[in-house]
C-alpha cells in the first residue's frame, strides 16, 4: 500500500520525467531487451536496433500508461483495468516481465535524475511500480 509520503515522492519525481516519456520509455525497453533478452519474444516484429521507431513508440505507450497511473494514483485499478485485460487475455505476458521492466525503469530514473532518486524516493517509486505490476497481473488469476 502506498502511503501519502510514497505518493508525494512518486508525483514529485514523475514531474521530472513527464516531458521525456518517449525517450525514457525507449531507454527502459532497450535496457530490458539487453539485460533480459527473453523478453524480446513478445516483440518479434520490432526492429531491435538502438533508437528504432518501434521501440520509441512502445516506450512512449508504456510511459504514457505510467503517467496516467501517476495521475490516478489513488485508483490504480481503475486506471489500469483495460491494460490488465489486454496483458492477461490477449498478449499473455509472463508476469515476471513487469518486474524486469520495473528494474530497468528505476535504472533510467537513476541515470537521468541521480540527485532526485534519494533512497526514500527510490523505495517509493519501487513500491509504485510493484503496485502497477500487481494491477497489470490481477486478471491473470
UniProtKB/Swiss-Prot annotation:
InterPro entries: Globin, Globin-like_sf, Globin/Proto, Hemoglobin_a-typ, Hemoglobin_oxygen_transport, Hemoglobin_pi. The gene is HBA. Red blood cells. It comes from Caiman crocodilus (Spectacled caiman). O2 binds at residue 58. Disulfide bonds: none annotated. This is Hemoglobin subunit alpha. Heme b binds at residue 87. One of its GO terms (biological process) is hydrogen peroxide catabolic process. Coiled coil: none annotated. Involved in oxygen transport from the lung to the various peripheral tissues. Keywords: Heme, Iron, Metal-binding, Oxygen transport, Transport. It holds the Pfam family Globin. Heterotetramer of two alpha chains and two beta chains. One of its GO terms (cellular component) is haptoglobin-hemoglobin complex. One of its GO terms (molecular function) is iron ion binding. CDD domains: Hb-alpha-like.
Amino acid at each position: 500500500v502506498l502511503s501519502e509520503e510514497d505518493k508525494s515522492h512518486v508525483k514529485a519525481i514523475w514531474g521530472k520525467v513527464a516531458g521525456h516519456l518517449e525517450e525514457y520509455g525507449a531507454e527502459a525497453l532497450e535496457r530490458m531487451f539487453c539485460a533480459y533478452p527473453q523478453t524480446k519474444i513478445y516483440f518479434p516484429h520490432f526492429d531491435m536496433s538502438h533508437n528504432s521507431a518501434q521501440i520509441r513508440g512502445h516506450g512512449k505507450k508504456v510511459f504514457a500508461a505510467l503517467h496516467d497511473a501517476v495521475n490516478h494514483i489513488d485508483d490504480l485499478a481503475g486506471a489500469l483495468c483495460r491494460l490488465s485485460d489486454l496483458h492477461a487475455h490477449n498478449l499473455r505476458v509472463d508476469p515476471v516481465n513487469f518486474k524486469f521492466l520495473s528494474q530497468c525503469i528505476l535504472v533510467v530514473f537513476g541515470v537521468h535524475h541521480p540527485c532526485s532518486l534519494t533512497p526514500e524516493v527510490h523505495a517509493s517509486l519501487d513500491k509504485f511500480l510493484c503496485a502497477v505490476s500487481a494491477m497489470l497481473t490481477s486478471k491473470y488469476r
